[in-house]
């Protein structure tokens, strides 16, 4: 799964971009605690462990 696909799912869940430094984008949710960081590296797939961490942080 690419970062673009992950961001699409997160945006549908209500997450929005709050900061970006280089290729790392941070997102925040209006009601869920914390932030989620997604590394956007073109069309490369996100490694499975990183993807699981993103879903866990996002509460999905």
For each of these PLM feature ranges, what is it?
Residues 1-19, 30-60:
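Basic nucleic-acid-binding interfaces
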Residues 24-28:
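Minor-groove-contacting beta-hairpin "wing" of winged helix-turn-helix DNA-binding domains
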């Amino acid at each position: 799964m690419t970062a673009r696909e992950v961001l699409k799912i997160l945006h549908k869940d209500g997450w929005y971009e709050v900061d970006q430094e280089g290729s790392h984008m941070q997102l925040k949710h209006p009601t869920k605690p914390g932030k989620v960081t997604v590394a956007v590296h073109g069309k490369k797939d996100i490694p499975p462990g990183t993807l699981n961490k993103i879903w866990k942080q996002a509460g999905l």
